Curated annotation (Swiss-Prot):
Binds to the 23S rRNA. GO terms for biological process: translation. The keyword Transport does not apply. InterPro entries: Ribosomal_bL9, Ribosomal_bL9/RNase_H1_N, Ribosomal_bL9_bac/chp, Ribosomal_bL9_C, Ribosomal_bL9_C_sf, Ribosomal_bL9_N, Ribosomal_bL9_N_sf. The keyword rRNA-binding applies. One of its GO terms (molecular function) is rRNA binding. Gene3D superfamilies: Ribosomal protein L9, C-terminal domain, Ribosomal protein L9, N-terminal domain. This is Large ribosomal subunit protein bL9. PROSITE patterns: RIBOSOMAL_L9. GO terms for cellular component: ribonucleoprotein complex; ribosome. Belongs to the bacterial ribosomal protein bL9 family.
Amino acid sequence: MKVILLQDVKGLGKKGEVVNASDGYARNFLFPKKLAAEATQGNVKTLNEQKTSQELKKQQEVEEAKELAKKIENSPIEIIAKAGDGGRLFGSVTSKDLAETLEKQHHIKIDKRKITLPEPIRELGVRHVEIKLHVGVVGKLTVNIKEA
């Protein structure tokens, strides 16, 4: 019997796949536990429509992320911090500071967890910081740290 899996089933397949299952296994286990639905023409058509709408949604998210990456690359930020001799900062500039400054200066809201900063910035100067906006979409933010 052909069934459409509504959830991942170990040993059978992943969610959204149309697979063959024995009649008894489908009727006695998969259907009662809502793990699968019978693969009728209507159900298969609905599944295909859902897959296409999900793909369109993913493409739209990627396009929005690419636009945001371009906007970020054209929006350098400037942070003024207290520094001592040799250009070392008192304290440091973290991803949280970068996210807040980006929102204040350019009205671009980014989650601080998306900012890739291996270690906090502790020196004056210009830095290039990567921001992971989506899978495969990375924006480069230019940060200029000046002395107060």
